[in-house]
């Protein structure tokens, strides 16, 4: 990218690695230079919490506000009833209105940690729900006034739809309507709130472009789209998942200690990149920390874990998590003679059952499986529920703790 931005927001997005594409860099840049501008990201309410995979979008909204603009978090109370088919292999299960409302209430909690809604400042954020304008739409009027602006040929060409059809997997008419509804959201946000920017992951490119085209055609306003990369770790894993499931942002679904441990276990090659994306440390410091090697990189991982946890759960929770980890892993707080199993690369992948036996926490594979089935086994203090879990080298970027009951523990590390 050779474009040299004038606005602080685009400069930050480029410098820290948030940008995958933009519909019009110069046009958006010039619009942002004119003063406080609203920009939004939509979040469908498919679960009671967002997970780490959504954190890059939340950080984009945070930077939008920090550079003087107005973030809008749009809750998909309406679109969740349809389901986004983008790059999904199957149709999402439909949720009831009560389930959607419960999910929105859960998701709402995390945003306040990152974005200011209550200061009364010009750039104070808005939280909106698209059911406000979608629930009362008249279907025939919508087809006549909005549907006529969409080409089915073009919609079929979008990669998010094309990939599904190429695999000969069903795409329901309900899901096919999702991109029209999301486009309508952008137009309504522009009409009601002057919103000029929609952001999202690169899988949302087609939906964003549809919204821009619809807004131009119907109300003749210029709006813009900006996408972030779909993030994977250096070993190709999808961001937001760990060996024991999704890394949720709400503390009642993933404890701050487990959240801290997820970041502490970052692969060496990802440290610098994640510091730029998920913290507010200066870029030069992120580069310096990311370039550390050997045992020194572990100090950078602790900084990463502390910074991200402090943003999400507060500085006190981050400090407590670090102290707990140090007590367990460094000071032997659960016994100075904590047994440690050191594995070589040739030993991996290894089954969790095999590791429980090798660490002496169970005498046999049968006993280890029974321990898991009876909720007596834990991995990094989280319940172990899958006896078929495999541990790979990437999972051992930092030592992991296995527990049997409350008093028997062991460490597994990569030698």
Swiss-Prot record:
Coiled coil: none annotated. A motif ('HIGH' region) lies at residues 45-54. Catalyzes the attachment of tyrosine to tRNA(Tyr) in a two-step reaction: tyrosine is first activated by ATP to form Tyr-AMP and then transferred to the acceptor end of tRNA(Tyr). GO terms for molecular function: ATP binding; RNA binding; tyrosine-tRNA ligase activity. Its main location: cytoplasm. Signal peptide: none annotated. It is an enzyme of class 6 (ligase). NCBIfam families: tyrS. Belongs to the class-I aminoacyl-tRNA synthetase family. TyrS type 1 subfamily. GO terms for cellular component: cytosol. GO terms for biological process: tyrosyl-tRNA aminoacylation. It catalyses: tRNA(Tyr) + L-tyrosine + ATP = L-tyrosyl-tRNA(Tyr) + AMP + diphosphate + H(+). Keywords: Aminoacyl-tRNA synthetase, ATP-binding, Cytoplasm, Ligase, Nucleotide-binding, Protein biosynthesis, RNA-binding. This is Tyrosine--tRNA ligase.
């Amino acid at each position: 990218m050779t474009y040299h931005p004038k606005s602080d927001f685009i400069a930050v997005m480029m410098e820290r690695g948030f940008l995958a594409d933009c519909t019009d860099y110069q046009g958006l840049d010039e619009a942002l230079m004119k003063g406080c501008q609203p920009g939004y990201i939509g979040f469908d309410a498919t679960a009671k919490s967002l997970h780490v995979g959504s954190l890059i979008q939340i950080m984009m909204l945070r930077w939008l506000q920090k550079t003087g603009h107005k973030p809008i978090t749009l809750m998909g109370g309406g679109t969740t009833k349809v389901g986004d088919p983008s790059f999904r292999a199957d149709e999402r299960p439909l949720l009831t209105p009560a389930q959607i409302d419960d999910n929105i209430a859960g998701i709402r909690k995390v945003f306040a940690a990152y974005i200011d809604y209550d200061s009364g400042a010009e750039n104070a954020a808005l939280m909106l729900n698209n059911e406000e304008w979608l629930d009362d739409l008249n279907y025939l009027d919508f087809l006549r006034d909005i549907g006529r602006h969409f080409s089915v040929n073009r919609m079929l060409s979008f990669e998010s739809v094309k990939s599904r059809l190429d695999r000969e997997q069903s795409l329901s008419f309900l899901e096919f309507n999702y991109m029209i509804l999301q486009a309508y959201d952008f137009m309504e946000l522009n009409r009601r709130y002057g919103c000029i920017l929609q952001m999202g992951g690169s899988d949302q490119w087609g939906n964003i472009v549809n919204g821009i085209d619809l807004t131009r055609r119907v109300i003749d306003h210029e709006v813009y789209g900006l996408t972030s990369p779909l993030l994977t770790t250096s070993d190709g894993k999808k961001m937001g998942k760990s060996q024991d499931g999704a890394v949720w942002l709400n503390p009642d679904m993933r404890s701050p200690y487990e959240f801290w441990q997820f970041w502490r276990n970052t692969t060496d090659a990802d440290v610098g990149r994640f510091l730029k994306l998920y913290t507010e440390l200066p870029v030069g410091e992120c580069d310096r920390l990311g370039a550390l090697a050997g045992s020194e990189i572990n100090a950078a991982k602790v900084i990463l874990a502390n910074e991200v946890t402090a943003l999400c759960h507060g500085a006190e929770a981050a400090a407590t998590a670090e102290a707990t980890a140090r007590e367990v892993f460094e000071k032997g707080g659960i016994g100075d003679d904590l047994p440690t199993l050191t594995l070589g690369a040739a030993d991996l992948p290894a089954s969790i059952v095999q590791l429980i036996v090798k660490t002496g926490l169970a005498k046999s594979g049968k006993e280890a499986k029974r321990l898991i089935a009876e909720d007596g086994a834990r991995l990094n203090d989280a319940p172990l529920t899958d006896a078929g879990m495999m541990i790979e080298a990437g999972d051992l970027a930092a030592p992991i703790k296995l527990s049997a009951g409350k008093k028997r523990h062991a460490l597994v590390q990569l030698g």
